[in-house]
Amino acid sequence: MAKRSLASLNAGDLSGKRVLVRVDFNVPLNDAGAITDDTRIRAALPTINDLVGKGAKVVLAAHFGRPKGQVNEAMRLTPVAARLSELLGKTVTKTDSCIGPDAEAKVGAMANGDVVLLENVRFVAEEEKNDSGFAEKLAALADVYVNDAFGAAHRAHASTEGVTKFLKPSVAGFLMEKELQYLQGAVDEPKRPLAAIVGGSKVSSKIGVLEALIDKCDKVLIGGGMIFTFYKARGLAVGKSLVEEDKLELAKELEAKAKAKGVELLLPTDVVLADNFAPDANSQIADVTAIPDGWMGLDIGPDAIKVFQAALADCKTVIWNGPMGVFEFDKFAAGTNAIATTLAEIGGKGCCTIIGGGDSVAAVEKAGLAEKMSHISTGGGASLELLEGKVLPGVAALDNA
């Protein structure tokens, strides 16, 4: 069901109105407390600027870290407010707590176009319990609700789901709208051939996605540490590579399901091996049928890269989730980098390339190719759940278009 978006509200609807905007400002900090990557803050700017331009009073709600329902001084949103002020070119006032007298006073003093950032909503235990009393107090600070936090949309919390019961309209922000358009679109109405590239170390964390994608895709390419569970299930020796023994039957079932559906399921034909898990480990390339004892696979091999590139060449939509190897180690980053480069190339020829959150995003950014992708998702768990076909509570709660 399509959701109503911020684009449907004009200045007449918003001028002078207090708009509660749930944003995803869960950014990484270094030991000195400085923000090391402000991507998520910048991703919310189109929505914030639109509201400011329409004369709304913008009240931002966000979580940061996992303070477990109590105040944690290291998890205050102070550095976020400072960075947001720089990006907007205007003062962003931060409250001492997300509800209560200070928040009420600062929101009450707002002029049209002002921006207030409420303190970390997870300092209140009731946030993650989706407590309706807390949701009502948050909602009392506003007249309209906008959810632009796709990365938190798979959680039914007070600030993502509960507040919608008290605020109308409740609409999707521009970032949320773009995420749904690309990810939902890729699953529901893709241009074909549709391929999914699934990587990462564990089959267990990607089971739901693999099952759902085998149902929907024409091709599924698998890389990362999880390939060794598939090889072992085929009866191959995998040395000391990572294997999930309790998922061997599942690996067989997934291969059988793909075959029965006529889906091309590709596993690497060769791998880059290491004698230990380290950036400077000794390495060698081996066919997957000839992995020696005492060695572990840390990347897909050069032959596998060529096979994967050939499989992707004619695709019109590609979803990528999870690296091909341990790309944090330069020696074992070739497979992941090759996929990033290939997606940039086919994207230039009209293929829709979607990077589905998590480590793939870091890989594409490390390769300097982020700008060449059609869409880079800001959600990790949320993207996976959407691709699995699950209903996201934070999306379901919004007004229908």
Curated annotation (Swiss-Prot):
Entry EC no(s): 2.7.2.3
Q: What does the record give as its pathway?
A: Carbohydrate degradation; glycolysis; pyruvate from D-glyceraldehyde 3-phosphate: step 2/5
- Keyword set includes Transferase: yes
Question: Which positions are annotated as binding ATP?
Answer: K206, G297, E328, G357, G358, D359, S360
* Keyword Kinase listed: yes
Q: List, alphabetically, the GO terms of the cellular component aspect.
A: cytosol
Residues that bind substrate: D24, F25, N26, R40, H63, F64, G65, R66, R122, R155
Q: Which GO terms describe its molecular function?
A: ADP binding; ATP binding; phosphoglycerate kinase activity
The record lists the catalysed reaction(s) as: (2R)-3-phosphoglycerate + ATP = (2R)-3-phospho-glyceroyl phosphate + ADP
Q: Which domain of life is it from?
A: Bacteria
Q: Which family does it belong to?
A: Belongs to the phosphoglycerate kinase family.
- The protein's name: Phosphoglycerate kinase
